[in-house]
Amino acid sequence: MLKKGKKTGSNSSGGTAYSPLAYLKRPYFRRSKACPLEQCANEDIDYKNKALLSKFTSEYGRILPSRITSVSSRKQRLLSTAIKRARYLALLPYC
């Protein structure tokens, strides 16, 4: 229902007009879908391999998601368990 005194058809957001370009998706760059751990098969995912595990953690010590590292889901699960095990044994910091 419309109440008296309320304007209809005007833009309620202020001085900006509707722009269909504002709702378009932002362009993004496609990353390669290849798993970086598949290329170097001689390195296995182990909790004692600090150099490999530190590549998949942020500078704050958090585990990077697979959409950033482009690691397959199976390797991501192995990485997360190895990182958690290395944290528990004080080989990697928690933060």
UniProtKB/Swiss-Prot annotation:
Keyword Ribosomal protein: yes
Classification via InterPro entries: Ribosomal_bS18 (IPR001648), Ribosomal_bS18_sf (IPR036870)
One Pfam family per UniProt: Ribosomal_S18
Residue intervals passing through the bilayer: none
Recorded GO CC terms: cytosolic small ribosomal subunit
GO MF entries: small ribosomal subunit rRNA binding; structural constituent of ribosome
HAMAP family: Ribosomal_bS18 (MF_00270)
Protein family (similarity comment): Belongs to the bacterial ribosomal protein bS18 family.
Protein name listed in UniProt: Small ribosomal subunit protein bS18
Gene: rpsR
